Amino acid sequence: AILALSIDLIWGYCGILSLGHGAFFALGGYAMGMYLMRQIGSRGVYGNPVLPDFMVFLNYKALPWYWHGFDMFWFAALMVLLVPGLLAFCFGWLAFRSRVTGVYLSIITQAMTYALLLAFFRNDFGFGGNNGLTDFKDILGFNVQAQGTRAALFVLSCLALALAFLICRAIVTSKLGKVLIAIRDAE
């Protein structure tokens, strides 16, 4: 639902159809998934305290450099925001500096999404490939399978959705919102 809000803001109010929003949300989800995989430790199928199970299965000898730090929640939470934000900034800067608009921007954002899909689905990069990241055990010390944890995650998700809605509403009703509508109407 937060993804839908973001698409509504950029497409409905700015008139910019970006098909890359899913990729940015997936990057954030993968960052949190990497944290959850690091929390499994020796409780995994192969009992390796350092490597996630899929890396043991694929004969990795050491943890890739970009997995370091994901054993700490604060680092993973920072990466959830930072990695997609930096990619969106770089991609947006290049696209808008080149004055790519309309259907061409939509095609380029879809191509970026597909490129990320291919990168994450290859087992060569250490992201789990087609198997993805599975068998999560706990988050912040709470069992992910417990009903209480699931209920708390649901409530937190609802609160995040409500906050995102309020932020989008504040943007739309502000002077910035009028500028966004003017950008859309000028096209």
Which ranges hold each PLM region?
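Transmembrane alpha-helices and adjacent helix-loop boundaries
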Residues: 1-187
